[in-house]
């Protein structure tokens, strides 16, 4: 298959007697090199039950990858083999409430771990969430867009336009791509829970403006600073009363009250309330 930024193959590690996934990353230009360096730096730090385990990172012909990548044209990330991903599972139909609850719990465990390590995933979506069908273990993978959320880490803080799947983007990310926190991953997790419970994407806009309109139709804007910003940048998108047309309870009539209560807490317009 193909991951977010490379070809993924299954293989057998004959020394360890285990099946592995090998992610090939072609380092053809400065941008792909930057993404690869970022992913390798991050994944080497992570070790958790709900994160795809990386065993080693190799250069061409299995050579050890020492130091910088700049002398190589390709790198191979050897990682834990996972049978399927959440996107494939959802294509087969809606999950049971019990399965959705189990997977959401594990997703939040994984997020708590990476966030405590000061890492934002930034591209959470069903295709980046892997499932072992044998024991129903969920693991977060594909850290190609992840960012270290540390003020001492040298980065400009900008999300490259078009990289993050827009259906899982938080309203803050749509309004200002250069201003984000760990709350963007929580928004994506909420969208994924709704999708697990209904089998349909929660907000599936054709473009960024429609995406924001769908969000504003359902998610109330509470904070005055958010209202002021929306009136300034997209006045035609908001109602004069600030009432939503289709609150979550109406949009998701078949989802139980407990899940709706949780979604209302995680899918807030302001990241500070999440």
Swiss-Prot record:
UniProt: ATP binding residues: 1-8, 23
The protein's Enzyme Commission number: 2.7.11.24
GO MF terms held by the record: ATP binding; MAP kinase activity; protein heterodimerization activity; protein homodimerization activity; protein kinase binding; protein serine kinase activity; protein serine/threonine kinase activity
Pfam families registered for this protein in UniProt: Pkinase (PF00069)
Tissue-level expression: Exclusively detected in the brain, where expression is restricted to the choroid plexus and hippocampus, and to a lesser extent in lung.
The UniProt record lists the keyword Isomerase: no
GO cellular component: cytoplasm; nucleus
All residue ranges annotated as the Protein kinase domain in the record: 1-274
Cofactor(s) essential for the protein: Mg(2+)
Record PROSITE patterns: PROTEIN_KINASE_DOM, PROTEIN_KINASE_ST
GO biological process, one term: intracellular signal transduction
Subunit structure: Homodimer. Heterodimer with ERK3/MAPK6. Interacts with MAPKAPK5.
Comment on protein domains: In contrast to classical MAPKs, the TXY motif within the activation loop is replaced by the SEG motif, whose phosphorylation activates the MAP kinases.
Stated family: Belongs to the protein kinase superfamily. CMGC Ser/Thr protein kinase family. MAP kinase subfamily.
Reported function: Atypical MAPK protein. Phosphorylates microtubule-associated protein 2 (MAP2) and MAPKAPK5. The precise role of the complex formed with MAPKAPK5 is still unclear, but the complex follows a complex set of phosphorylation events: upon interaction with atypical MAPKAPK5, ERK4/MAPK4 is phosphorylated and then mediates phosphorylation and activation of MAPKAPK5, which in turn phosphorylates ERK4/MAPK4. May promote entry in the cell cycle.
Name of the protein in its database record: Mitogen-activated protein kinase 4
Organism: Rattus norvegicus (Rat)
Origin organism lineage: Eukaryota, Metazoa, Chordata, Craniata, Vertebrata
The encoding gene: Mapk4
């Amino acid at each position: 298959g193909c991951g977010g930024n490379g070809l993924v193959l299954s293989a057998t590690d004959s020394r360890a007697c285990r099946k592995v996934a090998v992610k090939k990353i072609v380092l053809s230009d400065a941008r792909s090199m930057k993404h690869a360096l970022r992913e390798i730096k991050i994944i080497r730090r992570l070790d958790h039950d709900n994160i795809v385990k990386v065993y080693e990172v190799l250069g061409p012909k299995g050579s050890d990858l020492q130091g910088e990548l700049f002398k190589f044209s390709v790198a191979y990330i050897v990682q834990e083999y996972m049978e399927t991903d959440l996107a494939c599972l959802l294509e087969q139909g809606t999950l049971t409430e019990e399965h959705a609850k189990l997977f959401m719990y594990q997703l939040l465990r994984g997020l708590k771990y990476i966030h405590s390590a000061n890492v934002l995933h930034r591209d959470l979506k069903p295709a980046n969430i892997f499932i072992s069908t044998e024991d129903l273990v969920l693991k977060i993978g594909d850290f190609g867009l992840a960012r270290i959320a540390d003020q001492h880490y040298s980065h400009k803080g900008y999300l490259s336009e078009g990289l993050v799947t827009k259906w899982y983007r938080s309203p803050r990310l749509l309004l200002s791509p250069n201003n984000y926190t760990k709350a963007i991953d929580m928004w994506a997790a909420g969208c994924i829970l709704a999708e697990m419970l209904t089998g349909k994407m929660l907000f599936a806009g054709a473009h960024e403006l429609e995406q924001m309109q769908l969000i504003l139709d359902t998610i109330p804007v509470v904070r005055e600073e958010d209202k002021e910003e929306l009136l300034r940048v997209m006045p035609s998108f908001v109602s004069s009363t600030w009432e939503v047309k289709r609150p979550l309870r109406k949009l998701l009539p078949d989802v139980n009250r407990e899940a709706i209560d949780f979604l209302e807490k995680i899918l807030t317009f302001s990241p500070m309330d999440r």
